[in-house]
């Protein structure tokens, strides 16, 4: 059967007509014909390579017998939970679904609007053949297109895939946690993530981050199974790893660092345990499948992908978004906003994380590497490439962070519970973790509402200003001019702004993402912050730094 699959994939690669397929894609794509033809050739080669890999992996896989594991320890002693534990975890996932469906139709933010305009309402042909912006999370764009096509162009339809992927990541965390800790700790970690305002927010964001989180957890679970195994199990685990890892990469390209981290850990384990030679091949085939599936998924858009991602974000512009210190501050501020007690609670959480890291390090250093190394590689490479370093790039590690936090609570209770309290340590740890979950749930109201309130800003200006007196800048252009269809003027440079001002008694300027505007249009930013302009109204949403600012200039007679 495996050979038949391999031959079928190779046959598809051989018969696919390059020129005709490229022309068909070009009829709807944002890319030029030459780029698409190159992509079709890559797709043919990737398909042939994938088919050959299927055949080779089946031919050279271990056929039987037992061998040493690359990593000792296996599953947690409590890895086979009772039906009650599974039922409780399922109930938590249902609660998580309800929390993520509430207020799902609230206002979109810029990246979501960009996804809706470019991919949500476009043809599927355009979606699978275009990669003209770094904002394209390819797998999510496809899911969003299917959802919007079936349910209509609404905010909730655009976000529905993120909700589903977010809820699936809760169940995935539960199953992963059973491999490394007790059912009680696994359940509490799942509950904490279910009521986390950050996880709810990402699950209501039409981007690929919850899909990447799901893939990260599933791929890590399969990786553990691979390095733990002591007997041949066929291609089930290698193919499962390849599918999970490539799905994450298809969601967001930075997931490649997850695979790179696993590969580095595998090399280290092979070096430490030379006696486990029999367990090297299955893990090798897992990485081969991850590479082949990822290349196959990106093949058609790969020429565009390389061109789009090879350059730095906002080239030639100085911005705090590339500063690691800014990223640390922003991450801290975002986490503090989602915790009762703010920064004090965050500092206390840091102590618990340190204890949790120590505990997992004592349990297995390889586990610690699985938890931490992907995030370290992501930060290192993104900074080296000159790209903006967003805290959301590390959301794929949220499940691991929660596990570390819950372990830290157990260790902290163990350190503090002395004397007559020793016998109550487990109950006290449960109580402390439950209180943490309740406290986290108390911050959920801050999560709901428009991520950016473009609708309110548009209505405000419609009531107070004539259309010919209103102009937009940079990241305000798409939401107002394209998505809302406002008949306002687009300003591209300082000269355009000054010409727009000329002859008008009153000028209204609407902008968003002030940090971005200050970086890409410093001259305009300087003029808008001069004494000639004042802030008329600021519209805040739940997205940090995404405020919409309406500025007004009243002519003093100098322009007539």
Residue ranges and their predicted role:
Residues 86:
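Serine-esterase "nucleophile elbow" of acetyl-processing enzymes
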Residues 422:
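Catalytic-domain carbohydrate-binding cleft regions of carbohydrate-active enzymes
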Residues 2-67, 71, 77, 89-417, ...:
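Membrane-proximal helix-loop-helix interfaces that form the catalytic/acceptor-binding platform
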């Amino acid at each position: 059967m495996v050979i038949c699959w391999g031959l079928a994939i190779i046959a598809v690669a051989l018969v696919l007509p390059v020129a005709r397929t490229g022309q068909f894609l070009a009829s709807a794509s944002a890319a030029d014909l030459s780029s698409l033809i190159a992509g079709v050739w890559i797709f043919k080669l990737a398909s042939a390579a994938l088919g050959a890999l299927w055949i080779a992996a089946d031919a050279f896989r271990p056929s039987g017998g037992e061998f040493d594991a690359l990593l000792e320890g296996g599953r947690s002693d409590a890895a086979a939970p009772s039906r009650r534990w599974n039922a409780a975890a399922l109930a938590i996932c249902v609660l998580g679904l309800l929390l993520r469906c509430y207020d799902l139709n609230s206002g979109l933010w810029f990246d979501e609007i960009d996804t809706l305009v470019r991919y949500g309402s476009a043809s599927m042909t355009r979606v699978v053949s275009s990669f003209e912006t770094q904002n394209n999370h390819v797998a999510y764009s496809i899911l969003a297109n299917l959802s919007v096509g079936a349910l209509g162009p609404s905010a909730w339809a655009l976000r529905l895939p993120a909700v589903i992927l977010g809820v699936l990541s809760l169940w995935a965390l539960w199953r992963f946690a059973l491999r490394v800790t007790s059912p009680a700790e696994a359940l509490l970690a799942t509950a904490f993530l279910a009521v986390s305002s950050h996880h709810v927010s990402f699950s209501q964001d039409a981007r690929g981050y919850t899909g990447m989180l799901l893939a990260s957890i599933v791929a890590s679970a399969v990786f553990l199974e691979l390095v733990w195994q002591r007997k041949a199990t066929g291609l089930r685990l290698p193919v499962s790893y390849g599918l999970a890892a490539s799905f994450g990469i298809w969601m967001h390209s930075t997931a490649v660092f997850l695979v790179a981290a696993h590969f580095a850990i595998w090399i280290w384990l092979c070096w430490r345990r030379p006696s486990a030679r029999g367990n090297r091949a299955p893990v090798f085939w897992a990485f081969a499948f991850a590479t082949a599936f990822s290349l196959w998924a990106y093949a058609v858009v790969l020429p565009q992908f390389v061109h789009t991602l090879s350059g730095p974000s906002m080239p030639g512009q100085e911005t705090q978004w590339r500063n690691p210190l800014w990223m640390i501050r922003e991450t801290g501020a975002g986490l503090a906003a989602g915790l009762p007690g703010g920064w004090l609670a965050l500092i206390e959480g840091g102590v618990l994380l340190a204890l949790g890291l120590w505990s997992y390090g004592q349990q297995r250093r390889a586990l610690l590497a699985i938890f931490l190394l992907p995030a370290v590689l992501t930060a290192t490479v993104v900074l080296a490439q000159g790209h903006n370093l967003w805290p959301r790039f590390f959301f794929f590690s949220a499940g691991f962070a929660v596990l570390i936090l819950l372990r830290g609570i157990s260790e902290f209770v163990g350190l503090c519970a002395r004397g007559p309290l020793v016998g109550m340590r487990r109950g006290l740890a449960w109580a402390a973790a439950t209180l943490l979950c309740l406290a986290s749930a108390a911050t959920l109201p801050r999560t709901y509402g428009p991520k950016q309130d473009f609708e309110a800003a548009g209505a405000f200006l419609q009531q107070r200003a004539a259309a010919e007196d209103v102009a937009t800048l940079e990241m305000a252009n798409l939401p107002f001019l394209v998505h809302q269809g406002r008949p306002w003027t687009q300003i591209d440079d300082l000269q355009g702004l000054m010409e727009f001002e000329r002859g008008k008694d009153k000028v209204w300027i609407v902008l968003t993402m002030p940090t971005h505007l200050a970086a890409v249009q410093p001259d305009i930013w300087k003029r808008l912050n001069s004494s000639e302009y004042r802030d008329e109204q600021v519209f805040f949403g739940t997205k940090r730094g995404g405020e919409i600012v309406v500025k007004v200039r009243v002519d003093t007679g100098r322009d007539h």
